[in-house]
Amino acid sequence: MSNAKKFGVFLVVLLCAACMFVFIYTLVKLSLQEGESSSRLTQAVVNQIGEAAFDEELDANQIHALNLFLRTMAHFVLFSILSFGMCTIAFLVFAHPAGRFFGLVLNMLICAALAYGTEYFKQFVDGRHFQIEDAWLNIYGVIIGLCSFLIADLIFWAIRARSSSQSE
């Protein structure tokens, strides 16, 4: 591999790592905010969605259901994105298949620790509490992110193999 290509890969890894660091910081910052602030933020988003999606004002049951849906999807989607991004970094850092497998296993351990840790440390924040259901949603998000990455990698590999066989 040429030095220019190595430098390009280094820059991509550095950019991905910086983006993931910012993402993790934001995730932890949001996760560990005071309970009242978190509730106000979610309620404001629920009200905006309700106003945009429906012409009438939402009743208490609809507000509760939408609030639950948003919080559930936030856990799930955030950790899916985190896992997908960290898998991308692992594949850029490790070139050989054994190294990539190690990178994916390390990724899963880091993401699972973050998934559980963000929930665990909520109990030390005013107005927040630990919920094992949320920790499991986070871990399911990590698994979906990994599976999505592996599917995307297989599709990319198949396209690349097909294009190289057609060029011969």
Regions found by a protein language model. Name each.
Residues 160-168:
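Short, charged juxtamembrane terminal tails flanking transmembrane helices
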Residues 22-27, 111-118:
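Alpha-helical transmembrane segments of multi-pass membrane proteins
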Residues 4-18, 102-105, 147, 151-159:
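Alpha-helical hydrophobic membrane-insertion segments
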Residues 2-87:
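"…centered on the first transmembrane helix and the immediately adjacent amphipathic helix/loop
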Residues 95-112:
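Internal alpha-helical transmembrane segments of multi-pass membrane proteins
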Residues 115-143:
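Interfacial helix-loop-helix junctions of multi-pass membrane proteins
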Residues 77-94, 140-156:
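Membrane-interfacial alpha-helical segments at the cytosolic side of multi-pass membrane proteins
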